[in-house]
Amino acid sequence: RVEELQNLYSLPDNIVFYMATPPEMYEVIPLGLQKCGLAYTSDGFRRIVVEKPFGTDIKSAKHLTRLLESIFDEHDIYRIDHYLGKETVQNILVLRFSNGIFEPLWNRNYIDHVEIVSSETLGIGNRGGYYESSGALRDMVQNHLLQLMAFIAMEPPVAFDPESIRDEIAKVFKSLHHYTPEEMQEQIVRGQYTAGTIAGESVQGYRDEKNVSGDSVRETYVAMKIELDNWRWAGTPFYIYTGKRLSEKKTEIIIHFKSTPQQLFVGQCSGSSCNQLIIRVQPNESIALRFGLKIPGSGFEVRQVSMDFLYSSLSDKKLPDAYERLLLDVMLGDSTLYSRADAQEASWNFIDPIIKNWVKRRKDGLAFYASGSDPEEIDRLMPHDKKCNCCNEMM
């Protein structure tokens, strides 16, 4: 049928296979393509797109990579992450590497800490079967949030081409500090939502969802303090938060710059969050810079103000859907925004020990939180002196 269509419309022999299927089909489909001869061509290209999850641990990720590479070349394997198709995420590279005012400050000397937040008001819906075998750590942290962190933490690439950029992303994952068992208890919070109220509506708890065990210990919330063992970021923590059934749906990155060494003015922010660069990924893709200014009138009282930019203000045209951009890149052969095998394996090397620790501990350390609120346990992750103390309202 494919050959008939190509001949009918005089199309080149270029085919993209997009595996938006259950993970258990990730081996069956490539082997089937190989068996029927569709995986090869002498006059065009064959590319395959793989949705997450790309494996469930380091062993399965390596196995899937070996299988795909036995049929396709690595540069024809596209591991898709729709977060990287969002305009704001792509603009992190431009913001950092085309503006001289930011890059000189983008290091441990001037940045106190970084927060990466992805929260949802929805529960798991009809995905109980999938979520019971996955959880927030595999579903969100191993791919989406670590990828966002890599864009923030990576070194400048030697050139703006796919391999140079993916080289730097892989280096970030390889520099992830691996937790000791003691650090896992101190620097990671896992939680599960219970019944509660969101936007005035009562919602059920995770264990009451369809296809979920009544005594499940699967996490629907993860908060982590992550450190990178490299020159640029040594001593600067990255805090990652993600969860379902929280009070607000948003994904954003907050860069907290260090405060001045001395507080000279009344009302001056005294925490380490006085100057923030906020990159809003969704909804309403935007960038905001927060800083202190004098309130009009006598004296030198300071208020925090915000300089905002909305991507929608650049054009009346609707921003392209993340998948639209990413699938176009596949057709063009541009793998910049796709994960490479070594980066995937490095991220699984970081995640695997955490999963094994949780399996061993079962419900020990699992925090329960009412839908619409965060687990109380997250307060121990971030020291009080790193929390924003900007008590004056934004102007």
Residue spans of the language-model regions?
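Secretory/organelle targeting and membrane-embedding segments
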Residues: R1-V50, F54-M395
